[in-house]
Amino acid sequence: SNISHQFAVGSAQRIAQAYERLGYHWWPVDAAITNGQKGVRKGCNNCGPCDLGCPRGSRASVDLAYWPEAMAAGAELITEAAVQRIITKQNKVTGVEYIDANGNTQTLNAANVVLASNGIGTARLLLLSAAADCPSGLANSSDQVGRNLMHHPTALVTGVFDEYVDGFKGPFAVSIYSQEFYETDPSRGFV
């Protein structure tokens, strides 16, 4: 097995060998990790462990990859706040209502509002944002907001090897994966 990408740590080599013994194809994990200098972000050196945050800034976390550019373009970052609802006027989003760090309700008017609160938080805010012009919740004329949620659960497996494999280094959840069992197949006993 030859993993010729930047995350070719020993644990990935062992997993690639196991996949190949079983006849499974494997791929390098798609990772938002830079392998060279990019702004304030340094290239990955596989120092690990990525799941606890990257001490070099190689991992594309929101604070390094998006906020600096957004704030340079005029975005304002309000921390320790919880959005309670999205405000609309005549079927147009005009801002948000939030609770600030002191527990006070604040209103922020904005020309643009980006809603990115994951599958559950986004639906929650859309439903909490019901108003006269959207009585069933914002963007919910179909009554489907908050329904048909689909999760992509994952499993974490830890292995013990006879030799040292640097298992703590590189991207979280190793650096290769296989989708041999991605498609539904009732003959395997599960869907």
Q: For each predicted feature, which ranges?
A:
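Short alpha-helical segments and helix-capping/turn motifs at coil-helix boundaries
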Residues: S11-I15, D63-L64, D143-Q144, V160-D162, ...
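Extended catalytic-interface subdomain
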Residues: F168-V191
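A short, glycine/Asx- and small/polar-enriched loop/turn
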Residues: K38-R41, T88-T94
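Conserved redox-cofactor binding core of oxidoreductases
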Residues: S1-V83
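Glycine-rich loop(s) and the adjacent beta-strand/alpha-helix scaffold that form part
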Residues: R56, A72, A81, I86-I87, ...
